[in-house]
Amino acid sequence: MAKGDPKKPKGKMSAYAFFVQTCREEHKKKNPEVPVNFAEFSKKCSERWKTMSGKEKSKFDEMAKADKVRYDREMKDYGPAKGGKKKKDPNAPKRPPSGFFLFCSEFRPKIKSANPGISIGDVAKKLGEMWNNLSDSEKQPYINKAAKLKEKYEKDVADYKSKGKFDGAKGAAKVARKKVEEEDEEDEEEEEEEEEEEDE
């Protein structure tokens, strides 16, 4: 059985992935006969990345941004034929954020304003460190809020299913909802990075 969909666009690469790819190419040019020890190579790349300045990382950030544009464009073209998968209904209730994501939403703008030009990965890393340093009592307000949003989401899903997917009265809200979704998409990549930091 074929694995995945061969027509599906290649996934977008992060700035760090482009950096690792560049390191691998450099290694092949300098030592074409020497095989790469993946574990050792990954460790060296990680250490080198941590010591690089924002300016040095910026070219990889630009490469990642360009690749995201490529990926988004290809996914848009690919979208409707996504392996027979049902297209996401824009009227469906949006999955609620976790307590960690609520914390990120509050502090992400503060980190960005305090560190102009900071990369998405570094923002996510800082947020992950800040969250891990909070005590349970400091995390509780975010967790409580997330629990309430989850309750509301479950109720909205039940209402949504009972009313059916298409409700004519909701037509006027579609435009506003679309704008919110577009804004949400901009944060998707940051949230993916933040999710990784929360899991570490």
Curated annotation (Swiss-Prot):
CDD domains for the chain: HMG-box_HMGB_rpt1, HMG-box_HMGB_rpt2
Phosphoserine, modified sites: 98
GO BP term (any one): DNA geometric change
GO CC terms in record: chromosome; cytoplasm; nucleus
Modified residues (N6-acetyllysine): 3, 30, 43, 112, 139
Compositional bias segments (type: Acidic residues): 182-200
Record's comment on post-translational modification: Reduction/oxidation of cysteine residues Cys-23, Cys-45 and Cys-104 and a possible intramolecular disulfide bond involving Cys-23 and Cys-45 give rise to different redox forms with specific functional activities in various cellular compartments: 1- fully reduced HMGB3 (HMGB3C23hC45hC104h), 2- disulfide HMGB3 (HMGB3C23-C45C104h) and 3- sulfonyl HMGB3 (HMGB3C23soC45soC104so).
DNA-binding region: 9-79, 93-161
Localisation: Nucleus; Chromosome; Cytoplasm
Region described as Disordered: spans on this chain: 71-97, 163-200
Disulfide bonds: 23-45
Keyword Calcium appears in the UniProt entry: no
Entry similarity comment: Belongs to the HMGB family.
The protein, known as: High mobility group protein B3
Lineage: Eukaryota, Metazoa, Chordata, Craniata, Vertebrata
